[in-house]
């Protein structure tokens, strides 16, 4: 099983706290954490980050036949990118959205999540663990007949 871990704008600059590890983790550390977790789960990964909407769409469009699932952290594009939503809907590969923080606790305009309508599952506000929870859930979805109901964790 292989997943595309697709990260949107500014994820490459953010920093997170990792449970049990003092200090902060940068993007490279975050992706190392995700990679190690996926390795333990027996999931291959193709990790990509872009600050450009078109590049994210190109990755989504090239997913069929290349990966079995998409784990998407759309960053700010979550709130207005109908183009990414359309790419997800046109793509035959199931996708799960990860939001590292809780947008409802931020500015009012972040309460709308357009991209979520193209995803089968949503993991919101879990920090780095959200990636692994999303991968586990997506793997379970793919191991069933794929007809599982949408899943939201907040």
Residue map of PLM features:
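Short, glycine-/small-residue-rich phosphate/pyrophosphate-handling segment
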Residues: 47, 105-154
